[in-house]
């Protein structure tokens, strides 16, 4: 079974009737072999299914319509084995509402120089057939991924898998529902946004619920369910002995187990893949969920604090895109700085950082929480894994959306942080904190982000391209001057692109 189960990508091969039944039979056989090779590859995380070779405008339109209506098809790989006149593709490409990747490949890797003849030349025409197809895609102003190289090589298969993961992210975006418990943190700007515009742009729905709706489900959780959940905690984490020695702390842990099980039922029953809450809206709940939120993220749900539904969506989408990979994804906040020989950012939040990014087995402890509400709250404490990561922020610009991506390198803290009982990660932004923070602020990036070690910069940008939004990258080569120029150019482009 592939990572993404019954989801699939269709390989659609273009040709034309001109070549006759013999060539078309060989084209079909080769397409089946390529699809089978990709499906069997350990580098490709999704099933690739070859469709019948399309040879006319009607056949192209039919396969586009079939893809649109098939719930398991998340995207198409298009390839011209022979020459396929591109005017035939206009109707189908305009009708297609799922993403496609243009695979510029050839069935054979090498030319049989001593034996090559015109039959071989007629059969293997992707070198110019794909150029014809590329022309009409550009003429139609369709954004798409182009992957070039022999289909059987590891490099090409990795690129194909990367795109397939983005297609899965886009599929999730189209079907995602986000539950908002309460509202945004009062007077905060960046967590606001136009939810109707977001649904039009990204596909996901945002639904608001009063705390009473959640409270009913939480209160219905039984003591037996809570006891069983605490046994799970004992297996998964290093639980502080003080919790079981202190009746008050043990009650705080039981509160958290009840919150987790109640929220899980609410989200599962409602078909939600992400959620938000706010420490200013807790009426009816025992406390701001800490451990509960962390565990729900670990189970795959997206989360955004203080009502930040855009970040909640991005965390969920990053988790879907990175399924089966080593790196985790979490809600995160740029909390405080270390100005030293190398400037660093300490990322954390009040409680809600996902243990999928933990470097070691998390500790489960109860500590006093003093922001917004004053409660002892159970939470997981850990430090993030070292290595490359991304901080991704999606913001509402008023008339459009922008994605800001900062490449960072997560490092080990130089000392222990015994007085900081929260999950955290310490990172060094690329190219450095001075430039990265300046660029981020110029771009209007949020103080929250989707922090991920599971997807690449190219995958984040490809997702933004599928969504039709601006993406700007702050990385090793960024300068503030060039970045500001890019923002100005992008402002003009995105203002004009749909009308010129």
Curated annotation (Swiss-Prot):
Binds 1 Mn(2+) ion per subunit. GO terms for cellular component: cytosol. It is an enzyme of class 5 (isomerase). Its cofactor is Mn(2+). Pathway: Carbohydrate degradation; L-arabinose degradation via L-ribulose; D-xylulose 5-phosphate from L-arabinose (bacterial route): step 1/3. InterPro entries: Ara_Isoase_C, AraA_central, AraA_N, AraA_N_sf, Fuc/Ara_isomerase_C, Fucose_isomerase_N/cen_sf, Lara_isomerase. The keyword rRNA processing does not apply. One of its GO terms (molecular function) is manganese ion binding. One of its GO terms (biological process) is L-arabinose catabolic process to xylulose 5-phosphate. Mn(2+) binds at residues 306, 333, 349, 448. Keywords: Arabinose catabolism, Carbohydrate metabolism, Isomerase, Manganese, Metal-binding. Belongs to the arabinose isomerase family. Catalyzes the conversion of L-arabinose to L-ribulose. This is L-arabinose isomerase. It comes from Cellvibrio japonicus (strain Ueda107) (Pseudomonas fluorescens subsp. cellulosa). The gene is araA.
């Amino acid at each position: 079974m592939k990572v993404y189960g019954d989801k699939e990508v269709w390989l659609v091969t273009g040709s034309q009737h001109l070549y006759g039944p013999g060539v078309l039979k060989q084209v079909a056989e080769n397409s089946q072999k390529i699809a089978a090779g990709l499906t069997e590859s350990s580098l490709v995380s999704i099933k690739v299914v070859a469709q019948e070779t399309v040879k006319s405008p009607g056949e192209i339109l039919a396969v586009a319509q079939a893809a649109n209506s098939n719930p398991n098809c998340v995207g198409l790989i298009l390839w011209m084995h022979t020459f396929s006149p591109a005017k035939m593709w206009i109707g189908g490409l305009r009708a297609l509402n799922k993403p496609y990747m243009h695979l510029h490949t050839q069935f054979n890797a090498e030319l049989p120089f001593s034996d090559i003849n015109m039959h071989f030349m007629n059969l293997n025409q992707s070198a110019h057939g794909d150029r014809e197809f590329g022309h009409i895609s550009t003429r139609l102003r369709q954004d798409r991924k182009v992957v070039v190289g022999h289909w059987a090589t590891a490099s090409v298969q990795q690129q194909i898998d990367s795109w397939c993961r983005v297609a899965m992210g886009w599929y999730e975006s189209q079907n995602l529902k986000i539950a908002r418990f309460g509202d945004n943190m009062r007077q905060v700007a960046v967590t606001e946004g136009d939810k109707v515009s977001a649904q039009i742009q990204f596909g996901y729905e945002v639904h608001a619920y009063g705390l009473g709706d959640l409270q009913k489900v939480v209160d219905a959780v039984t003591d037996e369910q809570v006891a069983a959940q605490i046994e799970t905690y004992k297996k998964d984490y290093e639980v502080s002995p003080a919790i079981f020695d202190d009746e008050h702390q043990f009650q705080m842990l039981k509160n958290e187990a009840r919150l987790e099980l109640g929220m899980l039922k609410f989200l599962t029953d409602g078909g939600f893949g992400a959620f938000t809450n706010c420490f200013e809206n807790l009426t009816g709940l025992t406390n701001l969920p800490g451990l509960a939120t962390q565990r729900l993220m670990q189970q795959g749900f997206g989360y955004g604090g203080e009502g930040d539904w855009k970040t909640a969506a991005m965390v969920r989408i990053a988790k879907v895109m990175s399924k089966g990979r080593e790196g985790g994804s979490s809600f995160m906040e740029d909390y405080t700085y270390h100005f030293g020989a190398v400037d660093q950012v300490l990322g954390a939040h009040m409680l809600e950082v996902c243990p999928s990014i933990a470097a070691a087995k998390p500790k489960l402890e109860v500590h006093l929480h003093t922001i917004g509400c004053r409660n002892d709250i159970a939470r997981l404490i850990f430090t993030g894994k070292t290595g490359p990561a991304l901080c991704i922020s999606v913001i509402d610009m008023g008339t459009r959306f922008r994605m800001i991506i900062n490449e960072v390198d997560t490092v080990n803290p130089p000392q222990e942080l015994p007085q900081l009982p929260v999950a955290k990660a310490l990172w060094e932004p690329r190219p450095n904190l001075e430039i990265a923070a300046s660029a981020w602020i110029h771009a209007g990036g949020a103080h929250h982000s989707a922090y991920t070690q599971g997807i690449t910069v190219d995958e984040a940008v490809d997702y933004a391209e599928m969504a039709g939004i601006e993406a700007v990258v702050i990385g090793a080569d960024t300068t503030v001057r060039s970045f500001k120029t890019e923002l100005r150019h992008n402002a003009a482009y995105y203002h004009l692109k749909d009308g010129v």
